[in-house]
Structure formats: structure tokens, C-alpha cells
């Protein structure tokens, strides 16, 4: 996507890197002051059976490993939440083509974008809702970031805030000890 700032058009580029740090501790996460750092625990089990971030514009969350298969858009979708993007309110987008990145699971789409193209639209027991692998980042997603309102220094702007929440492995805590996340999938 592109954005226009002070009558100049720029190509939007997100540089995303990752590292595996199984021994990272809560204090290191809580004390983070680098806006480039995001913290996501990735585990086999998640209470609620879904990946999530801790809130809009945050920098931490919890991913269910099953959601991160090759071709999955879950990480990009959750990253959108960390940048402050909401789920759209109209969740029946039949006739509107390819779903944008921020549409959640359960969105009603044209058959070719469903888990099961033969299922009745909206039948979430038989695959009649959007398969997340079909979501794409679209120019309108970039516009929703309102990048033209950021303060830029040396060509860089900061999008999002710090939540810096350390998450325990959900397999080690009961569902009553689990704090319900603010933003789902």
C-alpha cells in the first residue's frame, strides 16, 4: 500500500523479524522500551481455543500454534490489532470479493472463500464461513492506520502502544486463573 504525507506519496513497508526466546522472563518483557519489540507466546493449547492480542495498539499476546500453519493469515491479522485496527462491523461481505485482513473468523463470504465452498453461507458447523487463509492486506487496511497523522523522525513513525504483558503457558493454569483477552482473533 501507499500513503500520502504532506503531498508526498510513500510505499508502506513493515519490517518484521522474529526470534525464539523460550527463557525470556516477565521482567524483561515488562521493562521493554523498544517499540519494535512485540511479545507473543506460542503454545499448543490456548484457553478460548484461539490466538489473541492484549488489546488494540498493544505489543503482546498469545498464539495457538495450530493457527500458524503455512499460508495462515492469523499472525498478520493479530499484528493488525497491535497497530490499532479493529474488526470490521459488517461481517456479511458476500459479493464484495476477497476478505481484507481484519475480518475475523465467522465472517460470511462468497463460497470460494469459505472453509467448505459447498456449505450454506453462515453455517459455522459445516464450514460456511471465511477460511482465514483467504484474507489479504488491502489498501483500505493501510488507510485505516492513519499513518499521515504520525510524527516521523528519520523516516520512521511509531504505531501502537506498549502493553508488555507476559503470558504463562495456558496448559499450566486453570481457566479460572486465565484473564480473558480484550481482542479475539
Locations of regions flagged by a protein language model:
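Metalloprotease/metallohydrolase-associated module, dominated by Zn2+-dependent proteases
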Residues: 61-70, 89-185
Amino acid at each position: 500500500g501507499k500513503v500520502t504525507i504532506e503531498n508526498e506519496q510513500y510505499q508502506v513497508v513493515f519490517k518484521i523479524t522474529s526470534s525464539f526466546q523460550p527463557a525470556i522472563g516477565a521482567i524483561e518483557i515488562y521493562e521493554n522500551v523498544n517499540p519494535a519489540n512485540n511479545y507473543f507466546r506460542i503454545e499448543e493449547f490456548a484457553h478460548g481455543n484461539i490466538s489473541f492480542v492484549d488489546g488494540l495498539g498493544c505489543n503482546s499476546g498469545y498464539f495457538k500454534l495450530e493457527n500458524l500453519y503455512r499460508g495462515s493469515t492469523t499472525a498478520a491479522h493479530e499484528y493488525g490489532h497491535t497497530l490499532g485496527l479493529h474488526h470490521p462491523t459488517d461481517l456479511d461481505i458476500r459479493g464484495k470479493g476477497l476478505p481484507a485482513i481484519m475480518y475475523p473468523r465467522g465472517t460470511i463470504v462468497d463460497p470460494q472463500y469459505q472453509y467448505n465452498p459447498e456449505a450454506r453461507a453462515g453455517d459455522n458447523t459445516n464450514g460456511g464461513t471465511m477460511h482465514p487463509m483467504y484474507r489479504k492486506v488491502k489498501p483500505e487496511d493501510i488507510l485505516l492506520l492513519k499513518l499521515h497523522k504520525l510524527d516521523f523522525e528519520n523516516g520512521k513513525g511509531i504505531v501502537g502502544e506498549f502493553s508488555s504483558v507476559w503470558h504463562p503457558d495456558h496448559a499450566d493454569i486453570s481457566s479460572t486463573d486465565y484473564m480473558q483477552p480484550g481482542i479475539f482473533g
